[in-house]
Amino acid sequence: MVWVPLLQFPIEWAALALLVVACLYWERSGFSGLGVEGCVASAMLGILVGYEWTGDYWLSCLVAAGAAAVFAIVSGTLVHLFRADPAVGSFALSLVPTSALGLLARSGDLRLFHEVPPPGLVTGTIFDGTYAEDLIASPWLLATPILLALAGWLLWHTPFGIRLRAFGENPGWRVPRSRPTALRLAALVLGALWTVPAAALLLRAHATAPPIALGYLALACAVASRWTVWGGILLAAGPALIRSARPYGTGFQSGFVILDVAPFLLGLLYLVFLSRRSLRLAASPQARIDPDVL
């Protein structure tokens, strides 16, 4: 048995963990974590298009951060102005950058996937050209534990309710003369920024076909963990392990398809067995208008 495909496990886990945190920020801002999928697609578009235009990897990551932030602001503003259902509105708006990413991926060869040495990795080490360089020489992967700790620390200081509608609800974070909507959008942008390192990791790990719908998988982990950071990160290990085992399914008929669908089936099982209370429809009308009520 070849163990090389399983080396993708830390990358898959890191990317899903970052997306779980992003979903928590969207949920605590009073919006739906379904919008994280649009943030991931926007970040991937920013990295790919930015590198095509500039040839500088880190500058393209800044472009990706801007693209993810713009999507968060635009989608949050539209959902707020039209008083749309956060889940339906976020899902519908996410289809726009996701479709654009699919069209770009099919438009031809992109520079980011064919540069030698690979951009975004530290070169000049003994791991150059080996399978281990994506683990040892990847600044994004090495920085992931720090980013997750920072995100968890920020959420730890905003413990009001399952969702937070605004960081301003915490007196320690209140900005004088600020409106709750502006604070909600600021939290939304902060959540969108966590998708940038996740997008960078996924583009490096899956250069031939950038993955989609992982934001939905991360949301399932967040919901099943009862909206906790570390619980969601631990639950993300299961789908990440299955995703890293996908190459083993090419040896038998329909194996690849089964392993491709299996992470989402596992996420569904998470929801069924671990979050029955979260999925139970509330009988009171307040549940439809108050984001702190599930």
Protein language model regions, located:
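Cytosolic-side transmembrane-helix boundaries in multi-pass membrane proteins
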Residues: 151, 159, 169-178, 246-294
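Transmembrane helix-bundle core of multi-pass membrane transporters
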Residues: 97-157, 255, 287-294
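Inter-helical junctions in multi-pass inner-membrane proteins, predominant
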Residues: 4-8, 155, 191-222, 253-257, ...
